[in-house]
Amino acid sequence: MASPLSSSTVVSHRLFFLHPSPLNRKFLFVKPKLPFNRTNSGDFRMRLHSTSSKTGTKELIHSCNSSIDSKLNTFEAGSKNLEKLVATILIFVQVWSPLPLFGLDSAYISPAEAVLYSPDTKVPRTGELALRRAIPANPSMKIIQASLEDISYLLRIPQRKPYGTMESNVKKALKVAIDDKDKILASIPVDLKDKGSELYTTLIDGKGGLQALITSIKKQDPDKVSLGLAASLDTVADLELLQASGLSFLLPQQYLNYPRLAGRGTVEITIEKADGSTFSAEAGGDQRKSATVQIVIDGYSAPLTAGNFAKLVTSGAYDGAKLNTVNQAVITEDGSGKVESVSVPLEVMPSGQFEPLYRTPLSVQDGELPVLPLSVYGAVAMAHSENSEEYSSPYQFFFYLYDKRNSGLGGLSFDEGQFSVFGYTIAGKDILGQIKTGDIIKSAKLIEGQDRLSLPVQNNNINEST
């Protein structure tokens, strides 16, 4: 069976790197200090006691006490002089150095921990945000998008919200939209021009457009601002999707015979309880034995992985598949022997890059972050191949149940960049936490994106040995 599961109930170590090691944590915010001083000289003796034999413990302590005390006094006297000397040197350097010397604790944090533990680590916190940022759209639209997304952070300020800054952001976005109208519409294919023009008008003057958003901000109504902002960002995303009519990069020659998805697709998965129980009802809803989740799969960032998954869905490969719940994930059983499939290379798009990396995980130690992060509740990714972590499983996928409590202060999963994430749950996320081992995928359907799915006629050149 493919990793992260080595059997239906045993999970590979890859999926359990979710808790920071005590060895990793203990170096965070550690200040330099002397090995021991007067307050811990007793501790030193206790450590010495713990290493002595049972028969000679008392004699050893008695014989060493006087020697230790004298040496401690000598050491402490010298250490105080040393501390004064170090303090003098630091003051001298502080005065003459152009750089401040605060934040010395960062020297004790490895590059990986600096990213994982930094509260300023900027990764999308929702699937919708990650998917919107992943669209390879016109630069003007990206400027508009960034200006509006900044308002989302400003709205989180509990008191004295900076409405003036919010208004400036919207006006900046509006100016770019008006000044670059021709560039924005020129990026849209001819057959979609009419729809693009309609969306552009909505963005400027529509009910959920930028002008209306400025009005809401002037009224200083945070609820209306939030609703208007969401509507404007949805319109921005719709325009960007029209501009991104296909892949913005060429696939490597060796992967041209793989199924691929050149854009977005939507998959609807119906899950059925196996033990006769029911899913908890939503507000005003009824108890039900089956529930539906929708996921958006992203071929812009993971065309091979999303394409292979879409192919399996359309062939009915997941219909009737059993689900297993493991630590922070819901994963399908291994069904690679039941369907014709091949292992797809590990595929991760680094943030700021124009094409994915293949068979190479991201190095968080070097500050690399993925366009589609795993650290989002409801992220959908392929498990590893049972033969090599450079490849994804040909069949097994999992829903990642992200929990901030099991992540670094920066909100990153400790497995970030190690799996091929290819989509996010956009509807039915409340269902994921209710799934139990043994529940069944009743059906999986590709309800949108069939026209973007390419299925090569011949797959003879695909290496199936992985």
Curated annotation (Swiss-Prot):
Record keyword Repressor present: no
- Residue ranges constituting the PPIase cyclophilin-type domain according to the UniProt record: 278-466
Q: What class of enzyme is it?
A: isomerase
Q: Where primarily located?
A: plastid
Q: Which domain of life is it from?
A: Eukaryota
Q: What induces it?
A: Up-regulated by light. Down-regulated by dark.
Please provide the record's keywords in A-Z order: Chloroplast, Isomerase, Plastid, Rotamase, Thylakoid, Transit peptide
Q: Which Gene3D superfamilies match?
A: Cyclophilin-like, Oxygen-evolving enhancer protein 3 (PsbQ), four-helix up-down bundle
Q: Does the keyword Thylakoid apply?
A: yes
This one is known as Peptidyl-prolyl cis-trans isomerase CYP37, chloroplastic
Whose protein is this, by species? Arabidopsis thaliana
Provide the gene name from the record. Answer: CYP37
